[in-house]
Design a protein with these regions (language model features):
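Short glycine-enriched loop/turn motifs at secondary-structure junctions
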Residues: 1, 53-56, 95, 123-125, ...
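N-terminal beta-strand motif that seeds the catalytic metal site of vicinal oxygen chelate
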Residues: 1-16, 60, 114-140, 151, ...
Length: 242
């Protein structure tokens, strides 16, 4: 579903150690590590800095091949000194066969290993995100506008939570103290979609976070545009032109 999800961290080395430690248990390998931007497929982190504050209150779920892998993810993390955010076990409120274990990363974001029988991610690393928001209805309207450009659709709706899904991944917006400073990117295969996304969202009154254009700093042909959601998180549509 995601082209990439990037968090900003207060201590890049410490956060990288955390994700290296726990993702290795899930057989998720680092796919890129240059320019101080480590990536594990569609999950990445970068150092916070002036005008680029730390990501807070995000929940990310990573796929585990078995319940035993969930148990090991949690045990290895706790043994390494990281804080538990919920012991491994069934979570029937999320699904009949849902089994998860939860840790907190060095900045207090929640990282989960999850196993459920009906599917396992095979096209990326992030299984799901939970993004807390001030106003569920306002955030839902924003992501409904983004959906046709990002290749996802709404799958669940309630006053307290809305879920959007595409392929085998999903993200939810839910009521709570807002998640801050996360970056979500969704891929398209033509520059015109990037242009139309940016025009549609800014004309609807959402804040520009970067106009359509090439970003060769990432790689030749990278063409993206950025808009801020109602809580200030950056949402991008990108065409890699590869």
């Amino acid at each position: 579903m995601f082209d990439h999800v990037t968090i900003r961290v207060s201590d890049r080395a410490a956060s990288q150690r955390f994700y290296d430690t726990v993702l290795a248990v899930l057989d998720i390998e680092k796919t890129y590590e240059e320019d101080e931007l480590p990536e594990w497929d569609d999950w990445s982190l970068t150092a916070a800095g002036d005008g680029k504050p730390v990501t807070r209150r995000l929940h990310v779920g990573f796929p585990a091949a078995s319940r035993a892998k969930v148990d090991e993810f949690w045990r290895i993390g706790v043994d390494a000194g990281y804080r538990s955010d919920g012991e491994p076990g069934p979570r029937p409120e999320y699904g009949d066969d849902y089994y998860g274990g939860f840790l907190l990363d060095p900045d207090g974001n929640s990282a989960e290993a999850v196993h459920y029988a009906e599917k396992l991610r095979d096209d990326g690393t992030v299984d799901h995100l939970w993004i807390r928001v001030r106003d569920v209805a306002a955030s839902k309207r924003f992501y409904e506008l983004v959906a046709p450009f990002g290749g996802f659709e709404q799958r669940f709706d309630s006053p307290e939570r809305a879920m959007f899904a595409g392929g085998t991944g999903s993200f939810s917006v839910l009521s709570g103290e807002p998640t801050e400073n996360v970056h979500l990117a969704f891929a398209t295969d033509d520059n015109a979609t990037v242009d139309t996304f940016h025009a549609a969202l800014t004309e609807a009154g959402y804040r520009d976070d970067g106009p359509p254009g090439e970003r060769p700093i990432y790689h030749p042909g990278y063409y993206g545009a950025y808009v801020l959601d109602p809580d200030g998180n950056s949402v991008e549509i990108v065409n890699h032109n590869r």
